[in-house]
Amino acid sequence: MTISTDRPAPVSSWRTYRRLLAFAKPYRLLLVAALIAALIEAAGTTGFLALMKPITDETFIYKNAEVSRWLPVQIILLFVVRGVAGYITDMAMGKSARSIARDLRIKVMAKYLRLPGSRFDSEPVPSMLIRLGSDSDQVAQAAVDAVKVMIQQSLQVIGALALMLWHSWQVTLTILVLAPVLAWVMDKVARRYRRISHSIQESGAQLLQAADQTLSSHQEVKIYGAQQTEMERYGALANRNLRLAMKVESTRGISTATVQMIGAIGLSALLFVAGAQALAGRLTAGDFVVLMTSMLTIIPGLKQLTNVQNMVQRGLASAERLFSVLDSPDEPDQGTVPLTRAKGLIEFRDVTARYPGQVNPALADVSFVAQPGTVTAIVGRSGSGKSSLIKLIPRFYEAEAGQILLDGHPVQAYALADLRRQIALVGQQVMLFDGSIADNVAFGEMRNADAGQLERAILGANAMEFVAQLPEGLQSHVGTKGGRLSGGQRQRLAIARAMLKDAPVLILDEATAALDNESERLVQDALHKLMPDRTTLVIAHRLSTIEHADQVLVMDQGRIVERGTHHQLLAQGGLYSHLHGMQFRERQA
C-alpha cells in the first residue's frame, strides 16, 4: 500500500479549525477564565478612553480641581485591574496552548508507532520530527495564542467603537464605511498566508532532512571531499526557505501598510466630520479627544488582527499536516486467534510482495517450511529479497499474494502484539536507546524482568565481560544510539535482549557481517547459546557461519532458486557453490 506524504488536500479553514478546537475541550475552564479576564482587560482599556473626556473638559477647560484630584487615582486603579486581568489571560491561554501542543505531540507520536512499515519508507524521519516539533507548536498558536490576540484586540476595538458611537454616531458611521474595504484586505491576506505556509513548512522539512543526511554521513562527506557539493545543495534549500520567508514578510509589510493607510483615511475623515460637528456645537473638546484616542486605539488593534492571520494560517497548514497523519490507517490488526506461545512452525505459501511504487516484486512465489527448533539460512546477492522475506513474518509489511503461516494459521489471524511477542530480532544495525544497559536489555514488555533473569541473559550473550568493567555496571549509560559502545558490544547486548525475551522464533539479519574476528567469535558463541529449541531464520553474509543450518534457501531476484543443506548445495555446483567459492578465494587471497 502506498502512503503519500505530499501536501494534504486543502479543506475548509473553518472545518480544520473546528477540529483543532476539539483539542482545547479539556482546558475549557482555563479558556473561560481567560475570556472573562480578557473582557475585564478590554473594559479597562475602554474605561481609560472614556476618562479622556473629563480629563480634557474638567481639567483643562473648566479647571475643576476636585475632578483633577480623583482622576489620577482612577487611572491607576484601572491599569492595576487591567494588568491583573491581562496576566490571567496570558497565563491561562499559555497553559492551554502548551498543553494542546503536548497532547498533539503525544497523539501523533503514538499514531506513528501504529502505522505500517511502508510509511517509514515514504516519509523521512526529519519530516516526522517537523510534525512533532514546530508543527505542533504552530497548531497550538493557531488554536489558542491567535485566539487570545483576536479576543483581546477584537474586544478592545468593539469597546472603542461603542465609545465612539456614544460620543458621536455621525462621526463613527462615517469611519465604518471603510469596514468592507478592511474586511476584503484581511481576507486576501489570510488566503496568501495559507498558501505560503504550506510551502514554507515543506521547505523546513527538506532543510532538516538535508542536514540530517549530511551530518549523519559526515565521514563519507569528508573522505570524498563532498563538503562543497553538500553545502551547495543545502544552500539552495536554505535560499528557497529564505525566499518563502520573505514572501511572508512582504505580505505582512504590505498588509500592515494597507491597514495603516485605511486607518489614516479614517482618521482624516474623523478630523473632517468632527470639525464640522464641533463648529455646530455638537462636540466638546473632550468628545473630540475621546474619538481621537479611540481611533488611535483601533488602528493598532486592526493591524494586530491582520498580522495574526499569519499565525492562524500557518497553524491551520500545520494542523492539516498533523491530521493527515492522524487520519492515516493503522497497521491492519484484526486477528482473533489466541496465541500464548507458538511452537514455531513457519510456512510461506507462494508469497509475492512488492514495495510501494516498485514495478518488480521484492519477492515472487516464495514457498518454504521452517520446522520448529530448526535453523533456516537465507543467502543470496545483495538485493535478492532476503531482508524483505523476514520483514513479512512480524508483518512490518504485508504480502501482495500468498500466505504466511505460523503454527498453521495465517499471521493475520493473530493480534499483532501476540504475533510479535513470539519473535526476537537481532539485526546488523543494532538500535540502542539513550539509557542504561539494563534498560536496553530489559526493553519494552521485559522491563519488569528481575535481576537474576537480566544477569543470566547478559552472561549468556558474552556481554558480562565488558559490562563488569564499566564504572556503573548494568546502570552504565550507553549514549545516543549506543555510541559509547563498540559494534561488537552493541551486538552482544542485542543478543542479551533476545535471550531475555526467550521467544520461540529468532530472526538474525546479518548479525555478524560488520564485526572483526574477535567480536564475531564472541557473538557467534552467544548465538549458538541462543538458537537451540527455537525456529531460527538467519540471513547470512558469511556462508561459513551457516554450514550447520538444517536448510539453506538461496535467493536471487526475489525467488528461491536453490534449497538444501550446505553440503547438498555445494555438490549441486549452482549459485550457492559460486558464492561460497568467491568467499573462499577472498579469504585465501
From Swiss-Prot:
Main subcellular localisation: membrane
Entry membrane topology: Multi-pass membrane protein
Cell location: Cell inner membrane
GO CC field: plasma membrane
UniProt cross-references to InterPro entries, sorted A to Z: AAA+_ATPase (IPR003593), ABC1_TM_dom (IPR011527), ABC1_TM_sf (IPR036640), ABC_transporter-like_ATP-bd (IPR003439), ABC_transporter-like_CS (IPR017871), ABC_transpr_lipidA (IPR011917), P-loop_NTPase (IPR027417), Type_1_exporter (IPR039421)
Disulphide bond pairs: none
Transmembrane intervals: 29-49, 70-90, 157-177, 261-281, 283-303
An annotated Gene Ontology molecular function: ABC-type oligopeptide transporter activity
Superkingdom assignment: Bacteria
Assembly, per entry: Homodimer.
Family: Belongs to the ABC transporter superfamily. Lipid exporter (TC 3.A.1.106) family.
Domain notes: In MsbA the ATP-binding domain (NBD) and the transmembrane domain (TMD) are fused.
PANTHER family in UniProt: ATP-BINDING CASSETTE SUB-FAMILY B MEMBER 10, MITOCHONDRIAL (PTHR43394:SF1), ATP-DEPENDENT PERMEASE MDL1, MITOCHONDRIAL (PTHR43394)
The protein's name: ATP-dependent lipid A-core flippase
Organism: Xanthomonas euvesicatoria pv. vesicatoria (strain 85-10)
Biological classification of the source: Bacteria, Pseudomonadati, Pseudomonadota, Gammaproteobacteria, Lysobacterales
